[in-house]
C-alpha cells in the first residue's frame, strides 16, 4: 500500500494492517499501535496524524483483539487475574458490605466478571460515609489503580476526595451525585410499577407502600414516584405512603396498618417486622418485595433486581473505559438502567371474590 501523505490515502479494497500504516507514514509499528489505542504518551500531533490516516484508509480495530492485547501489554502475558480494580465502600464498618444483602451480591457479580476479563477486584473502605477517602485515593494512585466501582452511597455522605483525573469510575445505584460519573442502577420506578400491577392482577385493591426516609432519599424518590404513578395507571384505593426514620420501631407500622387497612404492602425491610407484628401473610395481608435477594427466591413475591448481574455489568462498563483509556470524569455521564423480574412467591395469593383489573 502506497501512502505519500494522509490526504492522499485512497481506501483499498482491504483495510491496511498496522504494519502497512506504519511503513506508509514513516513511523514505527509500535507508534501506530499505541496511537490506535489512544495511548496518552504519544504526542498529540502524531496521534492525530495516524488516526486520520487510519480512518481514511478504512482501518478498523477489532475490539476483542484490542481488549485482549491491552491485558497482555499490562502483564506481559495473559493471566487469570491481572490489573487491580478498586471496589469502594463507605458503610459504618470496613467489612459491612460482606453482610449487606444487595452490596455483597453486587461485589460477587463484579468479582466474577473481573476475573473473566483478566482483572482483579479488590475492596477498599473509604471510612464511614467516605471520611477517609483522601487517604484511600492516595493509595489507589500510588498503586497505579486506574479503575474503581463505587458501591451504593447515601446522599449525606462526605464528598469523596479521589484523584478523579486519573481514575475511571462506575457508581452502582442512584445515590452517588457528587461528581459526574457513569452510573448503573436497577430501574426503581419500573420495578415499583411492576409490583403494583401484579398485585392488582391478583385482585388486591388497597395496596400500601412502606419506606424508610433514607431509602427514599438514596434513590431520589423513584419508588415514591413509581407508586403514585401506578395508583393512577392501575387503579385501586389511594393509600397514604408510610415513611419512617427507623428500621426498628414496629408500633408506627402497626398504627399505619390499623389506620389505612391495606390488603397488600410493597416494601423491602418491612417483611420481618410484619411477621413480628404477627400479621398473617398472605392470609391477612399480601406482601411484595422491591428487592428479592438470591437466598429469598421462592420465599417472597416481588422484584428480583439480580444484583449480581448489576455488578457484572458495572464491571463491563468500567473495563470499556479502561480499554479506551478514559481515566477522568466524563463530560456527559451515562446512566444505565437494569430491568428487574417479577417473581411469584408464597407471600401473595389471588383474592377471592375479586376480579383482576
Predicted regions and their residues:
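N-terminal helix-turn-helix DNA-binding module of bacterial transcription factors
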Residues: 1-77, 357
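Amphipathic helical "hinge" segments at domain boundaries
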Residues: 12, 59-136, 213, 225-229
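Periplasmic-binding protein-like
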Residues: 86-87, 144-152, 206-211, 242-243, ...
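Short beta-strand elements in bilobed, periplasmic/extracellular small-molecule ligand-binding domains
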Residues: 114-127, 179, 208-210, 221-249
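Flexible loop/hinge segments that line or gate small-molecule binding clefts
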Residues: 151-191, 289-301
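Hydrophobic alpha-helical segments within soluble ligand-binding/sensing domains
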Residues: 182-209, 249-254, 304-326
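An alpha-beta-alpha
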Residues: 195-234, 327-349
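Flexible loop/turn connectors
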Residues: 254-357
Amino acid at each position: 500500500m502506497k501512502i505519500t501523505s494522509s490526504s492522499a490515502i485512497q481506501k483499498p479494497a482491504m483495510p491496511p494492517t498496522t504494519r502497512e500504516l506504519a511503513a506508509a507514514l514513516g513511523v514505527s509499528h509500535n507508534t501506530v499501535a499505541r496511537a490506535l489505542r489512544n495511548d496518552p504518551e504519544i504526542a498529540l500531533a502524531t496521534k492525530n496524524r495516524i488516526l486520520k490516516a487510519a480512518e481514511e484508509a478504512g482501518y478498523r480495530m477489532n475490539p476483542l483483539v484490542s481488549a485482549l492485547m491491552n491485558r497482555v501489554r499490562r502483564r506481559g502475558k495473559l493471566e487469570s487475574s491481572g490489573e487491580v480494580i478498586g471496589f469502594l465502600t463507605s458503610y459504618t464498618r470496613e467489612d459491612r458490605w460482606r453482610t449487606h444483602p444487595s452490596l455483597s451480591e453486587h461485589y460477587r457479580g463484579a468479582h466474577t466478571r473481573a476475573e473473566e476479563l483478566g482483572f482483579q477486584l479488590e475492596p477498599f473502605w473509604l471510612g464511614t460515609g467516605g471520611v477517609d477517602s483522601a487517604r484511600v485515593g492516595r493509595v489507589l494512585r500510588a498503586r497505579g489503580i486506574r479503575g474503581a466501582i463505587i458501591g451504593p452511597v447515601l446522599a449525606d455522605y462526605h464528598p469523596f476526595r479521589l484523584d478523579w483525573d486519573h481514575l475511571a469510575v462506575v457508581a452502582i445505584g442512584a445515590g452517588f451525585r457528587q461528581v459526574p460519573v457513569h452510573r448503573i442502577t436497577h430501574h426503581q420506578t419500573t420495578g415499583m410499577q411492576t409490583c403494583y400491577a401484579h398485585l392488582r392482577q391478583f385482585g388486591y385493591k388497597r395496596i400500601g407502600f412502606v419506606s424508610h426516609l433514607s431509602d427514599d432519599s438514596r434513590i431520589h424518590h423513584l419508588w415514591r414516584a413509581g407508586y403514585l404513578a401506578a395508583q393512577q395507571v392501575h387503579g385501586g384505593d389511594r393509600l397514604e405512603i408510610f415513611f419512617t426514620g427507623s428500621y426498628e420501631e414496629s408500633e408506627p407500622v402497626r398504627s399505619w396498618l390499623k389506620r389505612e387497612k391495606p390488603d397488600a404492602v410493597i416494601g423491602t425491610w418491612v417483611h420481618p417486622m410484619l411477621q413480628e407484628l404477627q400479621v398473617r401473610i398472605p392470609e391477612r395481608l399480601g406482601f411484595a418485595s422491591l428487592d428479592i435477594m438470591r437466598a429469598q427466591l421462592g420465599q417472597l413475591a416481588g422484584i428480583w433486581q439480580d444484583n449480581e448481574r448489576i455488578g457484572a455489568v458495572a464491571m463491563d462498563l468500567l473495563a470499556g473505559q479502561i480499554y479506551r483509556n478514559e481515566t477522568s470524569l466524563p463530560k456527559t455521564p451515562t446512566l444505565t438502567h437494569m430491568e428487574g423480574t417479577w417473581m411469584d412467591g408464597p407471600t401473595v395469593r389471588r383474592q377471592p371474590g375479586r376480579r383482576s383489573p
